[in-house]
Amino acid sequence: MKKNNYILCFTLALLFSWAVPSVAAPLECTLEKNALPEQIKAYTQCLDAKLNRVQQEQDSWIQKRTFELSALESETGNTQILSLFKLSINAKDNYIQRSCQWRYMLKQPNAQQAVVTYKECEIAMTEQFIQQLKTAL
């Protein structure tokens, strides 16, 4: 029984040590000025991966703030706190979508450049929102 626990702990520690650097390492995407279509495709895929990481970080911060605000709501009895926070999250999602859409439309009819612009916009705005979520209550 003890041996199984040691094996389990070792396996979990190994998995955790393998997973942490990949999550913690920032993903940098670069695109040359006169890039070929294959390079643009690779850049777009890199932006997709970066956007996924940024959205995961955002989701973690939203969950953390939701938990904190729920506790604060139960302490104070103010039932508007959490609902206002959730409304602000929805408003932020709409703002990012619309703001990046008009930037996308500016780059049309060049579809590749438009997609890159949209993804870069979404990443930048999500990172800005994460910084706001990190601000202490």
Q: Where is each model-derived feature located?
A:
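N-terminal alpha-helical modules
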Residues: 23-137
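Bacterial N-terminal signal peptides that target proteins for export
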Residues: 1-10
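N-terminal leader/targeting segments
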Residues: 3, 21-24
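Bacterial N-terminal signal peptides
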Residues: 9-18
